[in-house]
Amino acid sequence: MAKEELIEMQGSVTEVLPDSRFRVTLDNGHQLIAYTGGKMRKHHIRILAGDKVSLEMSPYDLTKGRITFRHLAGRGPGPGTGSSSGNR
């Protein structure tokens, strides 16, 4: 049985709820309840109200989602990405 395709969206956290859940408003205005993914929970990534996040949603239930990445303001791509001419 194949795994269904997940919908990836971006939004901002509007409210921190109990039990590691968050109310997220997507860029298109839709609101949903989201929880942190496994590695984010394992490494204690803190998410606060106002943070920009990427999340995955199932096409079968668009009211719930899983936060997969927290975007930091003012941070560009990391040092290992992009084209650089260093280390020759």
Swiss-Prot record:
What the record says about family reads: Belongs to the IF-1 family.
Q: Which InterPro entries match?
A: NA-bd_OB-fold, RNA-binding_domain_S1_IF1, TIF_IF1
Q: Which GO terms describe its cellular component?
A: cytosol
Q: Which organism is it from?
A: Acidovorax sp. (strain JS42)
S1-like domain: which residues?
Answer: 1-72
Question: Where in or outside the cell?
Answer: Cytoplasm
Protein task: One of the essential components for the initiation of protein synthesis. Stabilizes the binding of IF-2 and IF-3 on the 30S subunit to which N-formylmethionyl-tRNA(fMet) subsequently binds. Helps modulate mRNA selection, yielding the 30S pre-initiation complex (PIC). Upon addition of the 50S ribosomal subunit IF-1, IF-2 and IF-3 are released leaving the mature 70S translation initiation complex.
The molecular function GO annotations come to: ribosome binding; rRNA binding; translation initiation factor activity
- Identify this protein by name: Translation initiation factor IF-1 2
Give one Pfam family, short name only.
Answer: eIF-1a
Known partners and oligomeric status: Component of the 30S ribosomal translation pre-initiation complex which assembles on the 30S ribosome in the order IF-2 and IF-3, IF-1 and N-formylmethionyl-tRNA(fMet); mRNA recruitment can occur at any time during PIC assembly.
NCBIfam families from the xrefs? infA
The alphabetical list of record keywords is:
Cytoplasm, Initiation factor, Protein biosynthesis, RNA-binding, rRNA-binding
